[in-house]
A protein has these predicted regions:
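Short glycine-/acidic-enriched loop or helix-start segments at secondary-structure transitions
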Residues: 49-50, 71, 114-115, 143-145
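A generic structural signal for alpha->beta connector loops
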Residues: 56, 82, 129, 207-210
Length: 260
């Protein structure tokens, strides 16, 4: 497992820096006046929300992992920031419906099996005119299987390993000494994978329009993590179906429900 995935406070701070430098400027492309009510679904420790809170936004984070929510509350309190954090399935929180001008969904979509159902459900939490910022790694990119969470140094640093056929991939994970929960999580990600084409099909089938899209050859978050300068994916590579997935380490979307 790469160190930042075990040091959650470091992970929080890295997320906050990337959000301030890249996510917020991207969102401001369509929302020059930053929305005041911000929800993050799958917020983890809350690092993405911290920079919004620093700008005076009212932030709410929801995650099914109670441990992550406890860490979010702790990290916010230690930094004197205000935020509401709830350990729950978002779709059980009817009191939050129609409240948020901005919803963040960062590195979550690739973990969800019913992507269309998830996207459709998100609409209930948007205020009129609200937007959703969605970011995810394309499945076929070098670490699209999240193998960096593995405990084995070989597995966690091995690009494209997740593209092996399922029985072989599972066998390699077991041979590398991964425990059952880690194997189960990595195999589940393989099942719920998110190629660009699959995501866009779910998006259009649930009545969203794309306000903006940017594919990245080098994920902006890699600057914080590895010191690599972000690189956008341009030209034919960005529009070639399937092929672009191998080169898109992060896919940014700003979307809204269709009017009418």
């Amino acid at each position: 497992m790469q160190e930042r995935h075990s040091d959650r406070e470091r992970y929080f701070d890295e997320q906050a820096r990337t959000t301030e430098k890249y996510y917020i400027p991207y969102i401001r492309k369509c929302c020059p006046e930053l929305p005041q009510e911000v929800l993050e679904v799958g917020c983890g420790e809350g690092g993405n929300l911290f920079s919004f809170a620093q700008l005076g936004c009212s932030v709410t984070g929801v995650d099914i992992a109670a441990g992550r929510i406890a860490e979010a509350r702790k990290f916010f309190a230690e930094r004197g920031a205000e935020g509401t954090f709830i350990a729950s399935d978002i779709f059980k929180l009817t009191e939050l419906e129609h409240k948020f001008s901005l919803i963040l969904v960062h590195d979550v979509t690739e973990h969800i099996d019913d992507k269309a159902g998830f996207l459709k459900g998100l609409k209930r939490y948007l205020a009129p005119g609200g937007v959703v910022f969605i970011a995810f790694p394309a499945w076929q990119m070098p670490f699209g299987g999240h193998q960096q969470i593995a405990h084995s140094k070989v597995v966690s640093h091995f690009p494209f390993l997740h593209l092996l056929p399922s029985p072989l991939y599972k066998g390699v994970l077991a041979a590398a000494g991964e425990n059952e929960p880690t194997i189960r999580e990595l195999m589940n990600i393989k099942h719920t994978r998110c190629p660009i084409e699959k995501f866009q099909a779910a998006l259009y089938s649930t009545g969203y329009r794309v306000v903006d899209r940017q594919l990245y050859f080098i994920n902006p978050h890699y600057e914080t993590k590895f010191g690599l300068k972000p690189r956008k994916l341009y030209g034919s590579l960005s529009v070639l179906p399937y092929v672009r997935n191998f080169f898109s380490t992060s896919c940014f979307y700003l979307v809204q429900p269709e009017r009418g």
